[in-house]
Amino acid sequence: KMSLVTTKKMFEKAFEGHYAIGAFNINNMEIIQGVVNAAKAQNSAVILQVSKSALKYAGPLYLKAMVDAAVAETGLDIALHLDHGPDIETVKECIAVGFTSVMFDGSHYDYEENVAKTKEVVDFAHSHGVVVEAELGKLAGVEDEVKVDAANATYTDPDQAVDFVKRTGVDSLAIAIGTSHGAYKFSGEAKLDFDRLDTITEKLEAAGFHNFPIVLHGASAVDESSVETCNKYGGKIAGAKGVPNEMLRKAASKAVCKINMDTDLRLAMTAAIRKSFGEKPEAFDPRGYCGDARKLIQELVEMKIKDVLSSTDSMK
């Protein structure tokens, strides 16, 4: 019987191969199927991740059962990951259900407390064979539970990153280099601090952390065609702006092994459903419009896997 995997091997291959694995936020069956169908078509490993509010919305047992079904159906390497775990209780709940990877987000605590709390999570998770992602430096924007205004967003300090990894034993690190959560990422021109990313990687390498995987949060491109479709069919999404795909591609070719996307899936799903409602006002079978949403999510994720993550054929 196929079962879920951790991200350990995935990230080793991704680092060596200069690509990244997509981590897609899931909330329901159609999103799971859209993402996994895309990964299967591209023969790519994939991370399905669940935020605290997704746990509340769908229930951990339903989400786990659907993801198990995806593994059984596709035979792909799939990791089930807790995104932005706010506390050790949530981490423990997810590990008990069978998640293979957890993120503890202590970035809103002061540094020493973040270290202490993260280490506690790492010790518990590792004793259960589960890998841990942590975050250092705050990302601006809004995503589910996470709200940080741009003025309070800080870039990750490279020396602190090394100290943090040393003292906590985390398996991967989410850093702040200019991305932000939500659909409104940049008011001006999009900029990512690649020099900072390189410095963090070099310093980790020098400290004995070989090929240490870096994670990029808030990395939706905010696809214009989805926004246009939403607005054409009655939506009001103004001024949305994401991270250009070519910047993400560059990050994936460096130490970034995991790129998180949530907003893009939300927009695609909403665009497909609005279009369906607009074009077929007489229809009322949810399988019609939910099926359209699943199909558009698959197309979007296939494009991401091919052109942004470059993780096509990573199952080989």
Report each predicted region and the residues it spans.
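Alpha/beta enzyme core
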Residues: V5-K13, N28-A54, P60-D77, G85-P213, ...
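Generic N-terminal amphipathic, Lys/Arg-enriched alpha-helix
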Residues: T6-G22, A283-F284
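Short catalytic/ligand-gating loop segments at beta-alpha or beta-beta junctions
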Residues: L216-A221
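C-terminal alpha-helical cap/extension of soluble enzyme domains
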Residues: K232, V243-K316
